[in-house]
């Protein structure tokens, strides 16, 4: 199974997507979008920006764990990760996203 973006509609009518790795694990979650077209644009932004140097920022969380965010060229966050036990694990997550996004499919579940 290849990596895939899953586009969903929330109960409040907004849209969001998750990037699932080939093993089915969620490796990136989007922000909420008011329109489906905006969410689809967000997916394209993730595809583009995930390949850009300096687009990812690994950060410590308040509980001592780590996560990363993916930013567009305008500085807006277009995706974030789950929490990882260590900075090294979060950095490995970044590499997973970089590898997965160029060929990831799309499952429209909205």
Curated annotation (Swiss-Prot):
Residue ranges that the Swiss-Prot or TrEMBL entry lists as coiled coil: none
A Pfam family the protein falls into: DUF1508
Sequence repeat placement: 10-58, 61-109
InterPro entries found in the cross-reference section: DUF1508 (IPR010879), UPF0339_domain (IPR051141), YegP-like_sf (IPR036913)
Keyword Disulfide bond belongs to the record: no
Keywords: Repeat
Annotated region (Disordered), positions in chain: 91-110
UniProt KW Repeat keyword: yes
Family per record: Belongs to the UPF0339 family. Duplicated subfamily.
Designated name of the protein: UPF0339 protein PA0329
Organism in which the protein naturally occurs: Pseudomonas aeruginosa (strain ATCC 15692 / DSM 22644 / CIP 104116 / JCM 14847 / LMG 12228 / 1C / PRS 101 / PAO1)
